[in-house]
């Protein structure tokens, strides 16, 4: 049995990983362990990649799982607009590494202002929408889209994409 360890105990990230494994019809054991990302609570741009990779590395070291999975949300200034997205990073115990990125979405100036004052995206969302702990529920994307797209949905596709070299090799016996 393959064991995949997620570097988070956030229920949205755990449920997104479960859904991705279900979509792929992979009967893998999933464990969620909180590990350090090594980046600020609100990563910007390249730090999002660093945080996701660090989570994958740290969780595989702590658990000795077959696969380490790190998910890190971040924001970045692109052409004068602040966007939010997530990076999903996978590392196998054999050293194979791959990553994928979620869809990106622009943030309203009210959120950007709070983020630039030192708030995390989730905190900024909670302040603006008068919610509590939205990062463990629908997330900023859910609040902004009236839950047409929520945080879990945003994560499922990049999890599938980050894992493809692993499950495709296992199913089809093809090299990466």
Swiss-Prot record:
Cofactor binding description: Binds 1 divalent metal cation per subunit; can use either Mg(2+) or Mn(2+).
Keyword Heme set for record: no
Entry-linked InterPro entries: ITPase-like_fam (IPR029001), Non_canon_purine_NTPase (IPR002786), NTPase/PRRC1 (IPR026533), YjjX_NTPase (IPR050299)
Catalytic activity: XTP + H2O = XDP + phosphate + H(+); ITP + H2O = IDP + phosphate + H(+)
One Pfam family here: NTPase_I-T
EC assignment: 3.6.1.73
Catalytic EC class: hydrolase
Binding site for Mg(2+): 36
Cofactor(s) needed: Mg(2+); Mn(2+)
Any one GO biological process: thiamine metabolic process
Keywords, sorted A to Z: Hydrolase, Magnesium, Manganese, Metal-binding, Nucleotide metabolism, Nucleotide-binding
Gene3D superfamilies linked to this entry: 3.90.950.10
Top-level lineage group: Archaea
Family note: Belongs to the YjjX NTPase family.
HAMAP family found in the cross-reference section: Non_canon_purine_NTPase_YjjX
Subunit structure: Homodimer.
Annotated protein name in UniProt: Probable inosine/xanthosine triphosphatase
């Amino acid at each position: 049995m393959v064991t995949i360890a997620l570097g988070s105990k956030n229920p949205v990230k755990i449920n997104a990983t479960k859904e991705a494994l279900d979509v792929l019809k992979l009967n893998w054991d999933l464990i969620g362990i909180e590990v350090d990302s090594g980046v600020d609570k609100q990563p910007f741009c390249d730090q999002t990649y660093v945080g996701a990779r660090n989570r994958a590395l740290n969780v595989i070291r702590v658990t000795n799982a077959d696969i380490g999975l790190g998910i890190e949300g971040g924001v970045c200034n692109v052409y004068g607009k602040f966007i939010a997205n997530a990076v999903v990073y996978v590392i196998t115990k054999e050293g194979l590494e791959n990553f994928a990125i979620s869809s990106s979405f622009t943030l309203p100036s009210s959120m950007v202002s709070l983020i630039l004052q030192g708030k995390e995206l989730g905190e900024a969302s909670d302040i603006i929408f008068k919610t509590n702990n939205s990062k463990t529920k629908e997330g900023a994307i859910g609040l902004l889209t009236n839950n047409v797209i929520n945080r879990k949905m945003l994560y499922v596709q990049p999890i599938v994409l980050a894992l493809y070299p692993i499950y495709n090799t296992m199913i089809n016996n093809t090299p990466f």
